[in-house]
Amino acid sequence: DGTKFAQHKTIVDLPVGMGKPGGIVLAPDGRMVMGVSAPCDSCTPASKYSAAVVSFMPDGSDLQVFASGIRAPVGLAYYPQTDDLLVTMNQRDDLGAQTPGDWLAVVRRGQQWGFPDCYGQGGSACTDVPQPTAALDAHAAVSGVAIVTGQLGTSIGNSAIVAEWATGKVLRVELAKDGNAYTGTVQPFLTGMKNPVPVLLSSRGAVLVGDWTTGVVFSIAKA
């Protein structure tokens, strides 16, 4: 029933963040890639593995920082047939009701995303900080992400399906690639949920979205 395991083994020991651990995915090179949130809303973390996307071998060895300066990297998904990693980012909560917005971004190895000083406001604090693919609602607790490239029909191809826990929204971010960069156009996708969190693509091409509050998993497939 999911409450007991015959055995378990800790393969990598990471710092504790403010919330739950971020997502974990298998990278094209065979490494595991995972998000680790900051231990606070706007402090400078003591550990280099906090507020970061980290990478390690499946047995837990060779722990590395993939990208840093991300307050809470939650959902992770690779764009199919590429090494382009899309990450949902929860931003700071101490700057007002409408600032800053959460982000969806393509994150590349070695990037520094500016937390806690840069949150998209521009100026010297954001010098050399990458730009997000799409800005989402403020304090939305953006969560899971899955990439569709035609499984739901040509009108919904090349899109990131993104869940916002706090707003109850599931959004579609239409992706356009220009060289190594992506731009995103945000559109509604699914309404009526309480607190959507995980978003997955099934082996049959359906988008699966889980509602944290109701315990219901919704399946959205091409008719």
Regions found by a protein language model. Name each.
Residues 1-27, 35-40:
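Asp-box/WD-like beta-propeller blade repeats and closely related beta-sheet repeat scaffolds
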Residues 13-16, 68, 137, 191:
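WD40 beta-propeller blade-start loop/N-cap
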Residues 21, 38-43, 48-64, 71-187, ...:
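Beta-propeller domain segments
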Residues 27-29, 80:
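A short, structured loop/turn motif at beta-sheet edges
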Residues 30-34, 106-107:
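Conserved beta-strand/short-helix segments
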Residues 197:
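Short, flexible loop segments at boundaries between secondary-structure elements
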